[in-house]
Each structure stands twice: as structure tokens, then as C-alpha cells.
Amino acid sequence: MELTSLEARVIGCLLEKELTTPDQYPLSLNSLALACNQKSSREPVLSLSESQVKTVLDDLTKKRLLSEQSGFGSRVVKYKHRFCNTEFSELQLSSAEVAIICVLLLRGPQTPGELKTRTNRLHEFADVSQVETALLALSQREKPLVVQLAREANKRDCRFLECFSGNVDDYDVNSSDAIVVSNHTQQTLQQDSKIVELEQRVKLLEQKLAQLESLLN
């Protein structure tokens, strides 16, 4: 799955608002434009017009990463993502992974410490090792969803880049050093992976049950 930088911004905004303001989700074009142009929690800060955002929405719809929805008696079209964790998306992520991908889409490369701080409204990580666990799982998928960048000069921690829109060729990738994680992270990774797998199975069963109930009704 490849995204342009603007598509990444839109998907990131939809993921964020779905979690932080669920009563206002899906989003109208106006709300989505405001979210894309937010001055906080966005790097870089943009100034997109509604027509520019609509063009991006049309492109995402063609990629089947977006769906439109209109309320009963309302002419306002609203938009919701099909990026992950829906019956239409192949990509299934844990809540921790969604939070990390969301921040990386909205803010670019981040260190584990930065991610722990900046995901606080999306998912509660007890410590940095839990962030590292999720990053390790994302990086070790058959098609990696994040990549660790080489440590910058005079910096203690490496940053991570999402692989959907991040142009890896523009960065120095950490090809020599293994991803540094704590002992706790290494010990719990397998357990967390099993939990994620079970959560995904439960979600699929719930979706199938809902489909059966709709047929019976």
C-alpha cells in the first residue's frame, strides 16, 4: 500500500479523529480540511483548501481506502477510512500499532520516546518498552510497516519511519545495528503477538455474526 504525502495526512487525520472524537466521526469535508491544517500535532503544518482535500479524497476512494457516508435526511457527505481494521481492509492492527502508525503519518519520523508522549490520546503505553514492542512487531511483518533510521549525530535514540508514504531513500536506514529494545520488550513480544492474533480473530467473528444477523432480519 503506497500513499502520497497528502494521502498520508488525510488517513492520519481520519485515524486520529476516529479515536479522539468518535462522536464526530466520520468527518465532513470541512472538518477534514480543518484537521489536515491543524497547527498542533502536525509536521509539517499545511494550508490546504477544501478543493485540494477533495482531490485527495477522490484518489483515496479510487484506491478503496475511503468510503462515503451520508446521514438520513442530510445532504452532507462524510468520509471514513478503510485503511485498517475494517471488514474491507486486509491490514489488521492492534490499538497500539494504530496509534503509532497514526502519529508517524501525521508527524513523520519519531523516536520511541516521542511516540510514547505523542500517542497519549490514542493509546496508553505504560512505558517506552511497550512502544518498542509494537515497533518491533510492525518492522518484522512480511511487508514491514515501519523502518528504523540510522541514529543521527549527537542523538541518543534512533527514529522510526512509516513505510506507507515515507520515502526510505531520503533517509539513512539502520542497516548495521539491530533494533535496540529492552529485555522486557524481547520477553513480551511473542505474548503480545498472540494477543493481537486473537483480537483479530474475534473481530472477524463479530463481523461475520453481524452479517448473519442482518440477513436474518
UniProtKB/Swiss-Prot annotation:
The disulfide bonds in this chain are: none
Task: Show the InterPro entries listed in the entry.
Answer: DUF480, WH-like_DNA-bd_sf, WH_DNA-bd_sf
Its domain of life? Bacteria
Which family does the UniProt entry place this protein in? Belongs to the UPF0502 family.
> What name does this protein carry?
UPF0502 protein Sfri_1696
Q: What is the lineage of its organism?
A: Bacteria, Pseudomonadati, Pseudomonadota, Gammaproteobacteria, Alteromonadales
